[in-house]
């Protein structure tokens, strides 16, 4: 294909069969895909104005295509006790607003484990907004799947339609106490053999048309599927004359970049392009070797005396050496 990788980010309308066929054949011909799909649509304007909204299924027409290729996008929202903060008005306090920080359970914060895939290795936490869960499905010979990111074990699922309200911050911590050993998958890597979604759906005339060059499978393809298009969306701030984008990974509560969404995205693209060198460079870790505090305290006096006395002894020794050399020279004369 003309392009080595393709990013499908946040579609808000339904894909036609023609578009789906083109994407399917792009994969069959050696292309690689990064999918960032929102299974549910959340009206943020209603949430800001009315403090609540309803998240409903967003029909993109891609659910069956992705299911066939190994990823089921679930029509739910993940609420996680390990989440980003949000600043809300907690009620009047005199004549001023009482702005306080709360846990925003609709925004999971995920840190990959020590045995993480190279895409996630040595990265700081990443941040999601209204993310859905994904299930790896339809395993076939020659294709493997791997969960790249998952929620914490203290996470729960709300199935669509989901009432999204600011009052969710009042949920007690006990609400998230589960017996789960693992979290819910949020990003999945699929690589290896893929079979065309349209192998048994196209009519024989079109499938066998040499000008169309239909391919039924590929032995080595790569796909990354994530159920949150906001993962790569820059936040914005108002400026004179309009709005300006903030860096990807910006946290409004702390007013700085603390999430590694950008590095994760770059690593994902590099992996799809089979550029391991770039991933290694971005994921390079620096090992800090802390000093032994106990040993420092025990030898503190010795080191102080050495630091002060060494220069004095060095000067005295140099002076004695010069004096001896001068005396020797005059004695010989």
Give residue spans per PLM region.
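Acidic, S/T/G-rich, low-cysteine, solvent-exposed domains in lumenal/extracellular/periplasmic regions
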Residues: 1-277
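Juxtamembrane amphipathic/hinge helix adjacent to a transmembrane helix
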Residues: 266-299
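C-terminal signal-anchor/stop-transfer transmembrane helix together with its immediate cytosolic
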Residues: 290-333
């Amino acid at each position: 294909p003309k392009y080595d990788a393709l990013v499908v980010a946040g579609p808000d309308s339904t894909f036609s069969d023609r578009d789906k066929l083109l994407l399917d054949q792009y994969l069959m011909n050696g292309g690689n895909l990064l999918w960032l799909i929102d299974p549910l649509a959340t009206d943020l304007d209603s949430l800001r104005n009315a403090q609540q909204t309803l998240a409903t299924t967003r029909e993109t027409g891609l659910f069956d295509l992705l299911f066939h290729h190994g990823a089921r996008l679930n029509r739910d929202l993940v609420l996680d006790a390990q989440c980003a903060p949000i600043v809300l008005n907690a009620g009047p306090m005199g004549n001023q607003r009482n702005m306080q920080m709360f846990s925003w359970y609709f925004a999971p914060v995920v840190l990959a484990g020590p045995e993480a895939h190279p895409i996630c290795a040595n990265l700081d936490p990443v941040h999601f907004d209204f993310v859905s869960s994904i299930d790896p499905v339809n395993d076939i010979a020659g294709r493997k799947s791997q969960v790249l990111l998952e929620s914490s074990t203290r996470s729960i699922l709300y199935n669509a339609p989901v009432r999204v309200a600011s009052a969710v911050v009042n949920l007690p911590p006990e609400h998230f106490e589960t017996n789960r050993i693992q979290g819910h998958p949020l990003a999945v890597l699929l690589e290896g053999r893929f079979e065309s979604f349209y192998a048994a759906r196209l009519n024989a005339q079109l499938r066998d048309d040499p000008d169309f060059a239909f391919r039924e499978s590929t032995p080595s393809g790569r796909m990354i599927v994530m159920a949150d298009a906001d993962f790569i969306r820059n936040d914005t701030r108002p400026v004179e004359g309009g709005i300006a984008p903030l860096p990807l990974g910006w946290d409004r509560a702390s007013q700085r970049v603390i999430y590694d969404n950008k590095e994760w995205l770059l690593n994902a693209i590099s992996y799809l392009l089979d550029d391991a060198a770039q991933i290694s460079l971005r994921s390079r870790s620096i090992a800090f070797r802390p000093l032994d505090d106990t040993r420092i305290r025990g030898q503190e006096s010795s080191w102080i005396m050495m630091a002060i006395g060494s220069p004095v002894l060095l000067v005295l020794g140099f002076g004695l050496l010069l004096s001896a050399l001068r005396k020797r020279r005059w004695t010989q004369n």
